[in-house]
Amino acid sequence: MTIRTRGTLPVCAATVVVTLAGASLSIQHSFGAQAVVIDRGSRDYTLPEQMQWRATEDGTTSSLYGDPSKPGLYAYIVKRGPNVWSKPHFHDNDRFVTVLDGTLWVGTGKFDPQRTVPLKAGSFVRDIAGGIHFEGTKDDGVTLYFIGIGPSLNHPAEASTTTTIGSGADVIDPAVRQVQRAEEMPKESFVLYGDSSKPGLYVQYQRRAPNNWSRPHYHSIDRVVMVLGGTMWIGTEPSGDRTRTVAVPKGGFIRDIAQGIHYDGSGNDPMWIQIAGVGPTATTNVDPPK
């Protein structure tokens, strides 16, 4: 259930006009240079403008993979407007939330919007199973990416079961919610949760420098990828041909299908992605045809 409050928001408009005269602008890439068909049986993807949205009690939602009410991995996006809050609740299993845009205000225990901490785009939250928590938005809205293993439903918390701890920076109970702020994250790739070589959910952040490409490879189990920054260029054939790739920008979603051969790279700009799946899984490289 959500609580909606009203606020007065400043309204501003800006118009930017750029005129290019007396010169021609040419941008050339060594990838994506021709019409490309991605093998959707090896790798499926959804561009931001292709996502299907529906209104729910939790906000405007786009389901990307699986179903939280059913067994297995799930992934979905929620958009919430300004001044929208959830009531204290808990989940059956751990849930993992990444802030894609805007600011999320998170709290634990008794509902109190003043006892929350802000998480900006790129920040990550682990909601621990059974832990009572709440969250919401203030003057700006938020876009959130959720992943986890179902079935895991939302259960409202009884008022008598909520407690309040700490003050200031200590308002988040780490036994209920574990927070990783974007500004405190390492600048290189790292594991957020789990281990892909062991049973259970794993979550990884991967950063790539410009023009950093993988070899053609496949995975033993499906995994899902969210582009958090830059552009991910994806292909689906053993050749690893960079000219036969499709650009997936920030906010795009990719499903690597088990046993499907694929490859990818960062192009001319740095790339930042989040990878999630269920272990144990392995990556097997594929030699290009001779």
Predicted regions: what is each one?
Residues 38-44, 114, 134-173, 243-246, ...:
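Double-stranded beta-helix
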Residues 81-84, 91-110, 209-212, 219-239:
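Glycine- and acidic-residue-biased ligand/ion/polar-headgroup-sensing regions
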Residues 2-16:
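Bacterial N-terminal signal peptides that target proteins for export
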Residues 111-130, 238-259:
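Short acidic-glycine-tyrosine-enriched beta hairpin
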Residues 86-88, 106-107, 115, 127, ...:
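Short beta-strand His + acidic residue motifs that chelate non-heme Fe in jelly-roll/DSBH
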